Amino acid sequence: AYRMMARAGGADVAYSEMVSCAGLHYGGNGSWELTECAEGEPDLAVQLFGTKPELFREAAEGVARRLGTRLVLIDINMACPVPKVTKKGEGAALMETPELAETLVSACVEALAPYGVPVTVKIRRGRYDGRELAPEFARRMEAAGAQAVAVHGRYATQFYHGEAEWDTVRRVAGAVKIPVIGSGDVRDAHEAARMLSETGARAVMVARGSYGNPWVFQQAKDILAGKEPFAPGLVTRIEAFECHMRLLAAIGAHLKRGRSLANWYLKGMPEAAFWRGEANKCTTLEEFLRVSARIKEAMAEAEDHGFETR
């Protein structure tokens, strides 16, 4: 549902959640489900993690066969900072074992060659504070066959605390010939445009900056084209929330997620705290839609009194 909202908002590519190569190998239905396109979803970039080359080769081939032309790329996650991942040598821990990382990339590149699917890598500044590995590591991934590298400007030990160091993105962009994707602290469309202009990145990866604002992608494109960025009105934002909730219901997701979605879509609206409280009582699609209908009624009354809501 999140991916479909992002694509509708102008995103060129949407990624799956991280999928374990071992999970795919041992037949976990839950793992394979993560690699599937939802109904109405045009295509997908699938994000894999693990440490075994043979499992990466098997996973990449399996995903390519299942998705066919809907597979945009395979991304190898070497950026995840979560301890349960890094303690197994996976995710950001791979930045400390570049030879293994090269082998994983090569395995995927070889497996996907018959399908014409590119392999990309996502990395961080490094694993440990003060030990920047990204530029040299990116060069090695390029030599192994990666066709793009996404760079998050924090160390793994920082998780998502502190500020992302965009100069790291710039240094990586200067170190490789393949496209670099900038990531980290891209909170709105203006920051996305600034990331491109200041770092030499060829693309921007946006996550938290799109929460409650799936239009951020088109807004960034507007800014780069010298246009006034699209500014959704309050009613448009509520209608987007309704659409997001219907998508969640359609894929059978737990609808309590709607409570956190409401927090994001309602941010900055009049009486937002009250309406968040109402949304936090909801458990079904019908209940969420009733709350959103009440919000729109309140907005219509406000408009009658001269307040702009569109």
PLM feature segments, named:
Residues 14-16, 44-48, 74-76, 119-123, ...:
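Hydrophobic faces of well-ordered beta-strands that scaffold small-molecule active sites
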Residues 19-21, 49-51, 79-81, 122-128, ...:
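Active-site beta-loop-alpha junctions enriched in small/polar residues
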Residues 25-27, 159, 213-219:
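Short, charged, surface-exposed secondary-structure boundary motifs
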